[in-house]
């Protein structure tokens, strides 16, 4: 009966009628069931489907008339139990087998955990990497794939890309124009590389509809590495009439070309030298078609190296689009005590009165944060992210930074957005016009249009630098920072606009904050264009005087479209700090995008009506008090400015921070704990938590400034590129299918480009897959960290390709690069895929350092007790991949180059690194390891480790060659194959090709292991492989002495000494010089040049011209602002200022004031007066009275309040405002009434601007240099162009001071003159002090040497030096030894001894080591093997059993597969069998290994990586599950006849009572009673025996009877008005059976008992048949 029939009249039916029931398993449904273990469903059928299917079957069994109960009874309870448990067990076992088999298949491709042959170690063969593989993982397919995959012929043709350059013996040339000559795997170092911007995009799309990728011959390249990927033009681009061109010949040539072809040269693009913007009036301003004619005209010019017609870009602000949400209300949120309320008037001003008017609401309640109210600013209480108002009292922890005095002073931040309101009362005091520009309007005023749509930039600016301690809005994070804005989003946006914004005044602006980007629509893949890319690179290489501009970017608001910020080329860049958002409660906001490029998080808005937003200033042109603030700033747009403000605090704490230092600080100090309520946190390989939502956690301002105070700049950045994997691989279109491929890299080990400590990792991918939004891409590092490079984007259904897109991940920060990297491409989307995709190419680019990057200031470490043990007590020190398990003397905190980032020259050279061989090879090309693998131990031979670290047995044969020991003098003790230096096994000095030599020839140098390697192409002689190691130069090159590089032209800051073909550095502060270091031709930014010297300000009697030079004033002027005698500001002695002139004597009506040095006007009526202003002669009709004042003739008889009118001839009253006068107007007063002041013949209540009160009642004018003053000698504001210093207005500040927006502020105490407040902004030093990199020192600091022109930087090889170049070192950095003035790294057979600062030879048994003695080995001399338990080189034990018993035995149990000591193989690296000449074996040997028995070859499980440990645990769990289920099945099988389960209700209903039975009539009757459902299950306790059923059930039913038959039967029918609350119906047969068995539902025997009774249970929906002894049947009814 249905649930819905609650009150209908329902007929149960005649008791004498028997419904016929059909078993669905024996009917049509039998065809759908393939086995007895389940129906037609998958093994992963959801539970809700199983339940629904069972209910349907039961319903069909009850109502299908095709099957009788007797037929169904044939399936016994035991058979059912067996079937159910056997099927369950079968499924579990099958799942475990599939899982184990999958791990066996997977492990050879990822971690090599399970292997049965040495060949499997190198050559991965499996389903996941085979193009023909399917998703059915069975053993037959495994064998098939192994048989069909051919082996590699040699190690060089391995299918897994191994970045190992042992066979690459030549240095390939680097094409200085493009990338054509770049060697795969080469890497560069930023500190001295050419930033080559000539990149050609060759990755076109499969179809024009996908996207039109512009081919560029001159894109931007960063040391040969394009970091941004292919830039694209929209499918329907709107072209403008502007053309960007690159003309290296300069502006004059650009003007000529523009004029020739009818263009107008609009000038240079931002700070990008030789890049100009052309405009043509005959080209449409907006067109869907490009102008090929004008493009061709520009391309025809040889001087035009690159050009691009500009097209509009779609760029969106990243504030929250709440207007699209139905729950959004634009009301202001106001604070009440104990809660928040919604103000119905959105324009209500933020005042206590307005707050009290609002009614209390219980909807939003947060903790009271009144204890944090330390600012009087009215909106500070709403800035919950600053005052502990987030959940659990958390915030951005800005308070400790403020308490230390860091408020952003001296730091300049610019907001790249839609402009900022410069006159906003909460911003005006901090506004910096030099950090601002209006690109849309092409002027210097960034004020946006006041149309309601351009508030974004102003709001962001308020978060950073809103003025504190005033009565407007709130406070900024860095409330004393200088704030500027760029108006760029309030009009068309193109590549030129972005480049201009990103390169605006990079020497002045420290931090750029941007809260915009491409569309966050879940389908766009876009990034910066070629000019914006160049602006980024120019910023990090040249901004902030070489320390690099800091770019802070909002990660994106595409969360509701499941967008990924890895598809945004701005946040996906290594140059930007990508910032995400967290809600007030510490959760992920609805708009957040997840990606692997996010570095950290700040608080922002959350769910409208639940989480608070950000309070800041607001744009309002009318400055209405109720419109200039807001509490509704939202999205990641609000997060990025908060991060920029925190970075400003850190920059104030340490102005020397580079752009990379800032990223390190953010990574090291961000806190995961406040955001750990949100899932998704993972530990990376150096035990640092990261999240795809929040990066490394919530930024911590207090921790950042504390660490910044101790921070020393990180070492130069190295860039290591892997080989490109160009093998096409199929991406299966089936849902859930995975393409897995891997790459073995060595991190460019052994080269100058080595990366041991990772920062950023880029994975450049080219693939085709439609739709590409289905894809999820994962990258796993050798340390087991998995980073998701791309999440599924369901809206990305139109495009099908990624063209060389560089997916960035910051999750590997601090890990090692060396080892196996695994890339997985997963089809995780539900959209249909018509054909498989193709992974065409992928490549890894590693950014990082070769030495420990974190090196705190040594003086702080030594003086502070809590910092003396950095590894144990400093909270900022983390373990790194390279120093885990290493001794303390490696990877220390010593600063090898404190000034590594001061001189950073761009466009100098392009590095061509090369990789030395890790060990010396024999002259015939055979590896020595293979040649002597069978020899005896090193101890028995008695050899010592030579420079080549080789030993050889006397009788060892290499093929058919016998090793001799009577050899050439150049052969070492290893012997030779014959006479002559070409037959040596190894060399005693150096090796050149196949010959041993005593010294390397010119244009080569000996590398670390004694091989003569060629110098860089520009070097004639060198000390290393790089272009910055030249000692002398190749022909037609100039030697840049201090950099040790060779160039064809001297770079800026150098002059050419043609006599000795060198480039000599100019003196400090010179940007360029000529013929002599002190003869400057241009100066650094913010400096001026006078007589070819650079100063912070022009000297006296000079003025600054437009070209930043100083010119002399006119001879009459002391200071001036122009060249003529009418441009004077102050005068020389004996001259007086009058109308911008300097006069010897003042004109009539003026007198010379010797105190003011000005010509002051005489009193009214005076013709001449003395120097003190006393009249000596009056004008006509004026008379000199007794007080020496001139009065009108005839006024002697007038009273004091009258004047004499010569027209009327009588006295007339003065104006009412005057006390006395000489005329009727209010401008004719000569004195004033009490409480009034006389100002220029007027009586006023107070002096106006430019006057001060003198003698109590007179307003005297300020000095002509002052615009405001409080007395004659105390100016408070100066005229335009003058500087205020201690109340005096001057043309230039005094020595020791600098101009800070018109006010002279003190320089750093060691500076004599300066350009700013920082330590490194000195321009001149006190006498006897030395200037080095902008700082003044008593002596040249470490890393500099004293020259005739100040301190010059040492070569980067040196720690200290006494001259330029790599041969002038006097001490070396750690791990380098001084040898004849040259710092050389220790050989592979040596270790660095810190006490003597020298390289010492390792123990004889060690090939490489980290210390003295035999227990410090890192590598061993064959045939010894490294025992990692004690770092000792030992031989293999001959008797393994004896070795296990004898712990002191100098041997180890060797692995039969690898030949190494057991448990010593390095995780993630390849293993090879010692003695094997190839890294690979044939397919026959691999196939044979599967068929060998266990005695022939051992099947080894190695726990050498995280994945293998997980594999072992998983296998053990599966085996345990199988064992447990086997035991359970055995027990249940034995007791199956006695078990009753809740789902199967076997119930033998007992007779109710003998007394009741006796009262019944003897004639056959039927009885029915209803059992009320009281919420219990009467068999949940389990019926253990028939006796318990007989004894208990009847009593229980009696207690629950609610209806009994009363009266006579009515045709064996009864009616129920409602089935509500009826649990079951019992049918009782009394007396002998009167019906025939075949027509009865119930058959009663002679005793009145039921024979066959059908029970329908409402709880289980299953019918059961009772035993014949039952007397009562129950039919449950579904109520």
Curated annotation (Swiss-Prot):
Annotated membrane topology: Single-pass membrane protein
Alphabetized UniProt keyword annotations: Cleavage on pair of basic residues, Disulfide bond, Glycoprotein, Hydrolase, Membrane, Protease, Repeat, Serine protease, Signal, Transmembrane, Transmembrane helix, Zymogen
Family matches, as Pfam families: GF_recep_IV (PF14843), P_proprotein (PF01483), Peptidase_S8 (PF00082), S8_pro-domain (PF16470)
Tissue-specificity statement: Transient expression in a subset of central nervous system neurons during embryonic stages 12-13. Expression in developing tracheal tree from stage 13 to end of embryonic development.
FU repeats: 961-1006, 1009-1056, 1060-1104, 1107-1152, 1156-1204, 1208-1253, 1256-1299, 1301-1346, 1348-1393, 1396-1443
Active-site residues (renumbered): 417 (charge relay system), 456 (charge relay system), 637 (charge relay system)
CDD domains given in the database record: FU, Peptidases_S8_Protein_convertases_Kexins_Furin-like
Low complexity biased stretches: 147-160
Molecular function terms from GO: serine-type endopeptidase activity
P/Homo B domain boundaries: 714-852
UniProt subcellular location: Membrane
Domain Peptidase S8: from-to ranges: 383-705
Record-given protein name: Furin-like protease 2
Source organism per UniProt: Drosophila melanogaster (Fruit fly)
